[in-house]
Structures are given as C-alpha cells and as structure tokens.
C-alpha cells in the first residue's frame, strides 16, 4: 500500500491510515500497513475515520516535540477531550 511505498523512499515518519473497503472492510489494508519489513517502519492507526483522527493527533505529537506552542495546544486539546467525556458520562449516569 501507499504508506509502505512512501516509507521506503523517505527518512521522515510515515503514518498509515487503513481505509475500510472491500469484503474485509479494511482488515486487508490494516495488515498490509502493519506488516512492513525491517527498516521500513510505518506508524499505523485504526481503520477508518477514528484512525484518521488519531493519525492527525500523532502527527501533532511528533511535531510538538520541537514546538512548545504546539505542545501546549495539544495538551489543551487533550484536557478538553477529557472534559467532554466527563460531561457525556455525567449525562449517561443522571
């Protein structure tokens, strides 16, 4: 798949997002992205839209290692996600 081809031609981090398609609903994409040979790493996230969201967050985490402003925004984002989950939990339990 494309992520593996890209990873074979660069020294930059590559994030693979398996796309849900076909009779296996993306499982074939997941396996081909995960099973790369030694020396050709691909960071692989979940199949579909949740994987795409996690890929974006992972990319920001990588970039934030060298950018304090981005690191703070990421921290704020994660705190906000936690607060949203707590609000949803409170609604479910009330």
Language model features: what each stretch is:
Residues 1-18, 22:
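Glycine-rich phosphate-binding loop
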Residues 27-94:
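C-terminal binding/interaction regions
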